């Protein structure tokens, strides 16, 4: 009886700690089941149980124990249990072999659908929403900001979550606070966590967002309010990984868990639904993929998506082609990043040949909410080559480039990236031509960087933001720049510029004239009208 009670307690304790799904297609559950069958076999199936010590005696001042195998045997129950363990593991191995890429290459290739387009269809980039900062920089900014708040840093630390989201069309990283240690948890868990950190990935500004209702369910809880444990109790058979921390359009905190189903056998998990947990009260709701709320950004995790995109590029012409001739075999480049397009976040990575040479064949964008994957064909330099080119432009400073982001400026593919010093802080920014990667522009701000590129190539950005201006012309001058007549004048001491082609009134402009217009980048007027 004692052994039965011991095993039941042991099963409950290990399940409470490790939380495997009660699902036969989960390797976690298979090992959990086999492990406990082995414990039961030891407790009830061996003739001598676990008492194999014959005698203990002292020799030359040392205690020695001898194993007693006399009379040891495995009874009928033990044999059944050991055979069951062997059978389960053998069946799992056989299923894995039969459903491996050797026999299922076409199925692996078709796990995801990749739509192919030309780069001319690559989304135009809103230059005010390019996430220049990388994750590590955002973490430093968030952690330092929290460190400046003495009333908070004594009780809490920033979680290492820093999920990148698109909020109101702009890229941010968000992370909840967590209890600094078990004592701080004990003192504060009743009232919960009242804030989370939000870092603007464009400007680098950080803020501590106050919550009307504090977070009660988080990854820093120790018992039943731990996020994964709470979800496992409610959904014991569902397969999910670490839920992502997200906020809705009103800034309310949630955890989003993608539910997986193996596509064949024990291989290739694919999302089938989403569970959303309200971090303030523990309420949960499961959504089908078609009904996921629009504020949710991360349904299809980056790592699984990239792995399955590689399946598509590797096995589309069969297993042996992938292993031997490697004709038309492609793979993603080493690294990825995120882009905010509209209200969604997109995974970005490059595509190169299986030989991993110094050129890309194109680029991948995946909508992380809908799972739609598009490949844009374009022969260009790899992201690593672009990084090396940018670092070479400032080699005297020993800056290291962040992983580049591909942007489309007036149908021109460009890599944009930050340049970090030894402390990991972004000091400058670089723009590298994706095709002719020796062409590099470096500046201390993104605005200056884009302005340099626009002036060098005589461009105006389609999505450039403008401001209205009305005033009186003073100190009027003109000059010819790159073949264009440009008028310079001051309004309230500030210099403005306008090209002669903007308005027919400009050749007749005089000091003292009142005008109105729209000011764009670098103080150039996009519209101009004399009143």
Predicted regions and their residues:
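Soluble extracytoplasmic regions of secretory-pathway and membrane proteins
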Residues: 6-531
């Amino acid at each position: 009886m004692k052994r039965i009670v011991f095993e039941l307690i042991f099963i409950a304790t290990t399940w409470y700690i490790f939380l495997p799904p009660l699902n036969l297609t989960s390797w976690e559950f298979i090992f959990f089941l086999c492990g406990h069958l082995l414990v039961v076999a030891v407790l009830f199936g061996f003739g001598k149980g676990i008492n194999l010590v014959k005698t203990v005696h002292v020799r030359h001042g040392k205690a020695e124990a001898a194993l007693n195998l006399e009379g040891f045997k495995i009874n009928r129950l033990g044999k059944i249990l050991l055979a069951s363990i062997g059978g389960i593991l053998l069946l799992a191995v056989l299923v894995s072999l039969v459903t491996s890429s050797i026999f299922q290459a076409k199925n692996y290739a078709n796990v995801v659908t990749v739509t192919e387009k030309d780069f001319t269809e690559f989304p135009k980039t809103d230059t005010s929403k390019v996430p220049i900062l990388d994750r590590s920089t955002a973490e430093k900014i968030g952690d330092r900001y929290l460190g400046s708040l003495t009333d908070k840093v004594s009780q809490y630390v920033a979680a290492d979550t820093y999920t990148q989201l698109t909020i109101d069309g702009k890229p941010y990283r968000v992370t909840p606070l967590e209890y600094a240690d078990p004592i701080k948890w004990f003192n504060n868990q009743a009232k919960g966590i009242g804030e989370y950190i939000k870092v603007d990935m464009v400007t680098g500004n950080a803020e501590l967002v106050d919550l009307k209702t504090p977070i009660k369910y988080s990854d820093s809880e120790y018992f039943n309010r731990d996020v994964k444990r709470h979800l496992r109790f409610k959904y014991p058979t569902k397969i999910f990984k670490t839920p992502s921390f997200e906020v809705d359009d009103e800034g309310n905190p949630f955890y989003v868990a993608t539910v997986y189903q193996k596509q064949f056998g024990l291989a290739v998990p694919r999302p089938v639904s989403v569970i959303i947990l309200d971090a303030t009260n523990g309420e949960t709701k499961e959504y089908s993929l078609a009904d996921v709320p629009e504020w949710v950004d991360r349904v299809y995790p980056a790592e699984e998506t990239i792995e399955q995109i590689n399946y598509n590029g590797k096995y589309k012409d069969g297993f042996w082609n992938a292993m031997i001739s490697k004709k038309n075999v492609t793979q993603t480049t080493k690294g990825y990043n995120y882009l905010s397009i509209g209200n969604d976040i997109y995974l970005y990575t490059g595509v190169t040949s299986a030989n991993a040479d110094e050129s890309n064949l194109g680029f991948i964008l995946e909508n992380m909410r809908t799972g739609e994957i598009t490949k844009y064909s374009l022969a260009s330099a790899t992201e690593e080559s672009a990084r090396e080119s940018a670092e070479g432009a400032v080699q005297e400073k020993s800056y290291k480039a962040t992983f580049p982001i591909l942007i489309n400026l007036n149908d021109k593919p460009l890599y944009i990236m930050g340049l970090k010093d030894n402390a990991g802080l972004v000091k400058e920014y670089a723009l590298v031509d994706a095709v002719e990667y020796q062409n590099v522009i470096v500046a201390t701000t993104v605005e200056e960087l884009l302005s340099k590129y626009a002036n060098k190539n005589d461009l105006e950005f389609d999505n450039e933001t403008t401001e209205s201006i009305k005033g009186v012309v003073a100190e009027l001058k003109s000059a010819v720049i790159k073949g264009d007549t440009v008028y310079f004048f001051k309004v309230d001491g500030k210099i403005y510029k306008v090209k002669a082609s903007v308005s027919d009134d400009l050749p007749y402009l005089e000091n003292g004239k009142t005008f109105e217009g729209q000011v764009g980048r670098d103080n150039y007027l996009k519209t101009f009208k004399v009143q």
